[in-house]
Amino acid sequence: MKKIFVTTFNKILFDKFAKNLIESFIETNQQLPLYCYVEDDIKLYPKYNNVFFINLFEAQPENKNFFIRNRNKYANYIQKNYLFDAVRFSYKVFAQSDSRKYADHIFFIDADTLFLKQIPDSWFNVCLPNSVFISLYDRLGYYTE
């Protein structure tokens, strides 16, 4: 069964920290491909081996519709508490849904994460056996990014 890593970011977040995720992915010689869903033109990003950039709004037009409908809907609440920013969190959900067409097992990696060493293939099977489907958006302490 095919396995992939998936993440989301835009050009601003790429320049801020997602480029470090990709560099650590390459330096640690990860064996699974990394699918990066972005909100902007994929031509803005450098080319890397085993890293694929996908425009999220083209792959999932309903995500763009959701963005347009909701981008200003809760602006007052979002300024006070980012947890109300449904648009911000929708990118992860739409990317994970779209990525199912590329693999049977999807491992979502936040863009501000770093790989410290290569993850052995055996770990993936222990973490997510073939008979399991799980999605966890744990919010203990409310730190989300």
Predicted regions and their residues:
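N-proximal low-complexity "stem/linker" segments adjacent to membrane-targeting elements
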Residues: 1-19
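Short, charged/polar "capping" segments at the starts of alpha-helices
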Residues: 14-16, 40-47, 143
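Short, acidic, metal-binding catalytic loop of nucleotide-sugar glycosyltransferases
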Residues: 23-32
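Short, polar loop motifs at secondary-structure junctions
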Residues: 37-44, 117, 139
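Active-site-proximal specificity loops/subdomain of glycosyltransferases
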Residues: 43-100
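Short aromatic/hydrophobic "clamp" motif used to bind/position activated sugar donors
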Residues: 106
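The conserved acidic donor/metal-binding loop of glycosyltransferases
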Residues: 110-114
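Conserved donor-nucleotide/metal-binding helix-loop-beta segment in metal-dependent transferases, i.e.
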Residues: 115-145
